[in-house]
């Protein structure tokens, strides 16, 4: 295995910076565009990603950016490939390599992630395009009689196989088992499912002999279900999240990054701030953010496909990055919004 992956993993979770998730699939991106009246075309998606990636000063707050297959093939107006643009800013380009979810046979309401077939050859192509790390997402829904242990173990196995192939090809794998926010479950239920899921993932990684020092975990925060009547506050979220990690994540892991998973931008930042404050310093693992919607939503609301609004939209992006950087040092406050 290429030992340079340790260096890349360390740079991705460097203190004070986060990772932008700009890897929404075409259908996901189109859905967001539709909501704000932006034309759903490849060119508009390219313009949107260009707005984010060309923002002046971005490198102060971002260590890496996760791209999508379409995006890593795109260029700026000046003809610079996005991956090269990031490299020039000393930001590490990565790529999401899973191919979405499909039904898990015999398990209604549960999904497994596709994309292992042909993965090694896709990775060779991405490496030639400049990518240095990969990401793969599994989804775990909480509902009546779900998740099943079968589903958790199957997704853990698939994540481990993906991680093994990634490291063999010289990439740092980001493994993302997302426990979904949808549902009316309590925070206690979310903690139980997240702990169980992470233990299964690390057992599968151990079995595949994946090197945890060259791997990053992308995790959900432990939250009450969206429709739960009793919503946990940020301090409760932090306590449940940190406890979950202490009970399930080996210390060798290079770092943990958080997904925002449908939280509002403010909620995600506030919860991150409380988690950082609670974690023992020096922490067992470096912690940072890897948000998508929680960074992009306010920016998209301003831009709405209008090139005259690019500067104002970039200012909103810069503001969210600054607020999350404050959260990484535990100094965020609501009145900074």
List where the protein language model places each region.
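Short glycine-rich or small-residue beta-strand-to-loop segments that form or flank ligand, phosphate
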Residues: 180, 256-259
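Helix-rich catalytic cores of soluble enzyme domains
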Residues: 119-204
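Catalytic core of soluble alpha/beta enzymes
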Residues: 181-252
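Hydrophobic residues within beta-strands of alpha/beta enzymes
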Residues: 65, 134, 173-174, 215, ...
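A structural motif corresponding to the C-terminal end of an alpha-helix
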Residues: 61, 125-131, 165-171, 204-212, ...
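Alpha/beta catalytic barrel-like cores
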Residues: 1-129, 142, 230, 234, ...
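Conserved, mostly hydrophobic/aromatic
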Residues: 41, 136, 175, 217, ...
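Short, histidine-centered active-site or binding-site loop motifs used for metal coordination
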Residues: 99, 140, 179, 221-223
